[in-house]
């Protein structure tokens, strides 16, 4: 039987996901057979697994850090918020229904927890180490009885817990003490030590606080991780939507059910992006309609709030319009949806020659394609699709060449006048394509072309893990685990 190590935090947003990612790479580098795990994740951003199901982006990234193919076993329960206090429940990669928060807590949660623990124990039997990520705070008093992502998991497999605090936001010592005081004695005994994350300054200034914690709880501070400027995707529960107007003004419609907004990180890094919600704000050089958890409802929201008309007017004035997945479907001529919204046939925005019908079977695949859109014709791109929609068009954006490593020849997306839409999530992570697209608009504005500095997820994981390795006592962790 392998070992388990759990990363919990004093609150949401302390950096649990990336500390876990770093530890996944560190232990993989040390030669251990390591895999990630999170029993339940609530996320607007999902990614395809090797089995063809969905998992959260956090566990997808951690799998890469472990040098493993992303599996549905790494994130058995995925909750995808739909609005109105409802979420789609995805179990082992497959949607099993839509429930209210109350119904989920009272009915499905414990049953799914038991099944997810069977998955965790099977992983521990087959691997040297499972690095488990918790969720939010482990001591929310109103939720603790229903919490299946923190100490209940640690107790189930007797996993030592590293408690992470975000010192950048202040109050980290109080958060650690408060968390420890609200844990039961059994739970406190599972805590092996503390990590202070995102520190700017001289760590020696913190030593009096370290001594206090060690004296009070008999637990060591395992390290202080500096604030790291990085390009790894963060967990999205507390995601900030930037309002940065770059030389090319890129506006992204912040839909009520926006999903997979990690698609736009490269645009944010290369130029800056501006998320907008009001019709009067819409006047960018590039206007993007992102993916949506409920395409038709978001289209109707845009229509009722004047955003659809504002997009059409901006397009008439010369703005370039882009749609990704659900955004692509909205830009077409019509959508027939009896799956997500049950509204039947709905008129689209009409900027793309495409029609979409929603099927009950979701397509969740890794894709490699060749671009047909003229300014980037012939470029090889890759990404992934997560969709119910099936679209037909007279002018496709690209031809898919590979689906999950299997050779195919399928058209996808659509092209119109100063408009394109695609099902390829991650299209802008293809730097050659993004550079060509931005420079097309820059030339129109009389700006000099730019060269986007290429980077890879692998490089960023290695750089982040190296800093974490230098900042925490990994040898102590190895000895504590008995590896």
UniProtKB/Swiss-Prot annotation:
Gene3D superfamilies: 3.40.50.880, P-loop containing nucleotide triphosphate hydrolases. This is Probable cobyric acid synthase. Catalyzes amidations at positions B, D, E, and G on adenosylcobyrinic A,C-diamide. NH(2) groups are provided by glutamine, and one molecule of ATP is hydrogenolyzed for each amidation. Belongs to the CobB/CobQ family. CobQ subfamily. Pathway: Cofactor biosynthesis; adenosylcobalamin biosynthesis. NCBIfam families: cobQ (TIGR00313), PRK00784.1 (NF001989). Residues 247-433 form the GATase cobBQ-type domain. The keyword Cell membrane does not apply. GO terms for molecular function: ABC-type vitamin B12 transporter activity; catalytic activity. PANTHER family: COBYRIC ACID SYNTHASE, DETHIOBIOTIN SYNTHETASE. SUPFAM superfamilies: Class I glutamine amidotransferase-like, P-loop containing nucleoside triphosphate hydrolases. Keywords: Cobalamin biosynthesis, Glutamine amidotransferase. InterPro entries: Class_I_gatase-like (IPR029062), CobQ/CobB/MinD/ParA_Nub-bd_dom (IPR002586), CobQ_GATase1 (IPR033949), CobQ_N (IPR047045), CobQ_synth (IPR004459), GATase_3 (IPR011698), P-loop_NTPase (IPR027417). It comes from the Archaea. GO terms for biological process: cobalamin biosynthetic process. Signal peptide: none annotated. PROSITE patterns: GATASE_COBBQ. It comes from Pyrococcus furiosus (strain ATCC 43587 / DSM 3638 / JCM 8422 / Vc1). It holds the Pfam family CbiA.
């Amino acid at each position: 039987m392998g070992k388990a190590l759990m990363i919990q935090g004093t609150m949401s947003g302390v950096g649990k996901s990336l500390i876990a990612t770093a530890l996944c790479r560190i232990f993989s580098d040390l030669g251990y057979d390591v895999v990630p795990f999170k029993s339940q994740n609530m996320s607007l951003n999902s990614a395809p697994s090797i089995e063809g199901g969905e998992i959260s982006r956090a566990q997808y990234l951690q799998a890469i850090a472990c040098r493993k193919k992303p599996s549905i076993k790494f994130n058995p329960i995925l909750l995808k918020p739909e609005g109105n206090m409802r979420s789609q429940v995805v179990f082992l990669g497959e949607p099993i229904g839509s429930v209210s928060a109350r119904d989920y807590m009272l009915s499905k949660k414990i049953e799914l927890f038991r099944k997810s623990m069977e998955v965790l124990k099977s992983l521990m039997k087959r691997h040297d180490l499972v690095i488990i990520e918790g969720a939010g705070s482990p001591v929310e008093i109103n939720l603790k009885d229903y919490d299946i992502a923190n100490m209940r998991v640690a107790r189930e497999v007797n996993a030592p817990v590293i408690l992470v605090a975000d010192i950048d936001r202040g109050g980290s010592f109080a958060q650690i003490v408060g968390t420890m005081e609200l844990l039961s004695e059994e739970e406190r005994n599972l805590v092996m030590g503390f990590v202070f994350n995102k520190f700017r300054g001289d760590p020696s200034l913190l030593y009096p606080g370290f001594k206090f914690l060690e004296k009070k709880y008999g637990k060591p501070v395992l390290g202080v991780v500096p604030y790291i400027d990085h390009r790894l995707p963060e967990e999205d529960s507390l995601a900030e939507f930037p309002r940065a107007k770059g030389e090319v003004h890129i506006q992204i419609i912040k839909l009520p059910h926006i999903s997979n907004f990690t698609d736009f990180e490269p645009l944010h890094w290369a130029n800056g992006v501006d998320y907008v919600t009001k019709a009067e704000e819409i006047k960018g050089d590039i206007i993007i309609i992102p993916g949506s958890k409920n395409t038709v409802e978001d289209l109707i929201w845009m229509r009722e709030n004047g955003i659809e008309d504002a997009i059409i007017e901006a397009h008439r004035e010369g703005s370039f319009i882009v749609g990704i997945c659900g955004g692509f479907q909205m830009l077409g001529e019509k959508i027939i949806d009896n799956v997500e919204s049950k509204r039947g046939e709905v008129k689209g925005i009409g900027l793309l020659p495409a029609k979409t019908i929603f099927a009950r079977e979701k397509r969740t695949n890794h894709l490699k394609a060749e671009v047909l859109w003229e300014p980037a014709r012939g470029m090889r791109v890759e990404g992934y699709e997560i969709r119910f929609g099936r679209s037909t068009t007279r002018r496709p954006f690209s031809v898919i060449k590979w689906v999950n490593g299997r050779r195919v020849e399928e058209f996808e997306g659509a092209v119109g006048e100063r408009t394109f839409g695609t099902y390829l999530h991650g299209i802008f992570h293809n730097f050659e394509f993004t550079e060509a697209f931005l420079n097309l608009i820059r030339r129109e504005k009389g700006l000099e072309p730019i060269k986007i500095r290429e980077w890879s997820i692998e490089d960023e994981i290695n750089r982040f893990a190296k800093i974490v390795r230098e900042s925490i006592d990994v040898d102590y962790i190895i000895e504590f685990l008995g590896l």
